[in-house]
Curated annotation (Swiss-Prot):
NCBIfam families: PRK04053.1, uS13_arch. One of its GO terms (molecular function) is rRNA binding. One of its GO terms (cellular component) is small ribosomal subunit. Keywords: Ribonucleoprotein, Ribosomal protein, RNA-binding, rRNA-binding. This is Small ribosomal subunit protein uS13. Belongs to the universal ribosomal protein uS13 family. Located at the top of the head of the 30S subunit, it contacts several helices of the 16S rRNA. In the 70S ribosome it contacts the 23S rRNA (bridge B1a) and protein L5 of the 50S subunit (bridge B1b), connecting the 2 subunits; these bridges are implicated in subunit movement. InterPro entries: Rbsml_uS13_C, Ribosomal_uS13, Ribosomal_uS13-like_H2TH, Ribosomal_uS13_archaeal. It comes from Methanococcus maripaludis (strain DSM 14266 / JCM 13030 / NBRC 101832 / S2 / LL). One of its GO terms (biological process) is translation. Part of the 30S ribosomal subunit. Forms a loose heterodimer with protein S19. Forms two bridges to the 50S subunit in the 70S ribosome. The gene is rps13.
Length: 149
């Protein structure tokens, strides 16, 4: 592996990443990629996780993008994906960046539309996962206590 010139910002899958960070940590700056997925991508592409991301060659960037595009064909197990059994296609997918954000928004909108419990809680801007609400999640202005004159 030859050292190419250092780039302070590298662009992978429509995302700018810091070139000074090690590759493992630079990949984790992308929305939808955590520690386990970053390590899996690096293992599949056979790159050095400690290498600064700014020294990546263009071929290596293309390799990383192809793995992120379709991780299943590169041997990454489906239990690592962030969207198992997609509602519309039935496939296991791993979404990143804007695809992930838009899909989550679409799921919440669908829950609101079918009026399920989680959808109603989202509409009311209350927690969906069973937290207690007596002391927390209070929004808006309160009247307070009026003082006698």
């Amino acid at each position: 592996m030859t050292q190419t010139e250092f780039k302070h910002r590298i662009r992978i899958s429509k995302t700018d990443l810091e070139g000074k960070n090690p590759l493992e940590y630079a990949l984790q700056d992308m929305k939808g990629i955590g520690r386990a997925m970053a390590r899996a991508v690096i293992r599949v592409t056979e790159l050095d996780p400690k290498q600064q991301a700014g020294y990546l060659a263009d071929e290596d960037v293309l390799k990383i993008e192809s793995v992120l595009e379709d991780p299943a064909t590169h041997g990454i197990p489906s239990w690592m994906f962030n969207r198992k059994k997609d509602v519309y296609s039935g496939l296991d997918k791993h979404l990143i960046e804007t695809d992930l954000v838009l899909t989550v928004q679409e799921d919440i909108t669908n829950m609101k539309k079918i009026r399920c419990y989680k959808g109603i809680r989202h509409e009311l801007r209350l927690p969906c996962r069973g937290q207690r609400t007596r002391g927390s999640f209070r929004k808006g202005t309160s009247m307070g206590v009026k003082r006698k004159k």
